[in-house]
């Protein structure tokens, strides 16, 4: 006769797991009923701020303290003058774009927060999935659909983090080229173009963050009964 298979935990370990579960359920309840509505309102207000409603993108440009070289010598200049080495002006400290950096300081924590909240929701729902057995699995299918959507949101938020990292890399490359090839004005223009593009990306991120929170609120609240009680059993509160 086959022996029953299961995970055996000591009494203390079982208590610790149960404490974790209860804390998880409380965090999920706090997230749904208080955090989500407040965050949607906050992001909606943030999108009304002047810093995220700049009409003239040229006003975002940061000064580039990169010397512009003298024009090349004339062809009739003496050969000895042509061979004479002129001192190359070296660029000093080149700061980032303060206006873009201030927006990054505002948006980046919001991106991290949504990613962590997605992980919270995923963990919460996973702990609500019942034992796999024959019977009515309609509620479980709903849980899986919600998990699928939350994971999709998390993936998009992770792409935001990549976009933020790429901004520094791409702008740094443009500044390096502008400081090395000081006679090429297009490299200077490239720096400004990258800053303007970053502003548009950051505003779009805030719009998406608000939309993602609204979507999470809608999909969870609309399916809450099946999420917390997939088998239709009597269970108190959200757990």
UniProtKB/Swiss-Prot annotation:
Coiled coil residues, start to end: none
Entry-linked Pfam families: PA28_C, PA28_N
Residues that bear N-acetylalanine: 2
UniProt keyword Acetylation, yes or no: yes
One Gene Ontology CC term in the entry: proteasome complex
UniProt-listed GO biological process terms: regulation of G1/S transition of mitotic cell cycle; regulation of proteasomal protein catabolic process
Family classification: Belongs to the PA28 family.
Binding partners and assembly: Heterodimer of PSME1 and PSME2, which forms a hexameric ring.
PANTHER family referenced in this protein's UniProt entry, alphabetically: PROTEASOME ACTIVATOR COMPLEX SUBUNIT 2, PROTEASOME REGULATOR PA28
Function statement: Implicated in immunoproteasome assembly and required for efficient antigen processing. The PA28 activator complex enhances the generation of class I binding peptides by altering the cleavage pattern of the proteasome.
UniProt-recorded name of the protein: Proteasome activator complex subunit 2
Natural source organism: Homo sapiens
Gene: PSME2
């Amino acid at each position: 006769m086959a022996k029953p298979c299961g995970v055996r935990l000591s009494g203390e370990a079982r208590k610790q797991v149960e404490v974790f579960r209860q804390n998880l359920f409380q965090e999920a309840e706090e997230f749904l009923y208080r955090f989500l509505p407040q965050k949607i309102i906050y992001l909606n207000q943030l999108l009304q701020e002047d810093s995220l409603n700049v009409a003239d993108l040229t006003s975002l440009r940061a000064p580039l303290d990169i010397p512009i070289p003298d024009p090349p010598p004339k062809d009739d200049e003496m050969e000895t003058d042509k061979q004479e080495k002129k001192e190359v002006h070296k660029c000093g400290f080149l700061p980032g774009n303060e206006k873009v950096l201030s927006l990054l300081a505002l948006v980046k924590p919001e991106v991290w927060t949504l990613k962590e909240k997605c992980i919270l929701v995923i963990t919460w729902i996973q702990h609500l999935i019942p034992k796999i057995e024959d019977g009515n699995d309609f509620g479980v299918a709903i849980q899986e659909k919600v998990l699928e959507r939350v994971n999709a949101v998390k993936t998009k938020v992770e792409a935001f983090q990549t976009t933020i990292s790429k901004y520094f890399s791409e702008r740094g490359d443009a500044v390096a080229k502008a400081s090395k090839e000081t006679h090429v004005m297009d490299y200077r223009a490239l720096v400004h173009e990258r800053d303007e593009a970053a502003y548009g990306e950051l505003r779009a991120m805030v719009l998406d963050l608000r939309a993602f929170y609204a979507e999470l609120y809608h999909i969870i609240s609309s399916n809450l009964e099946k999420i917390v009680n997939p088998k239709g059993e009597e269970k108190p509160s959200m757990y």
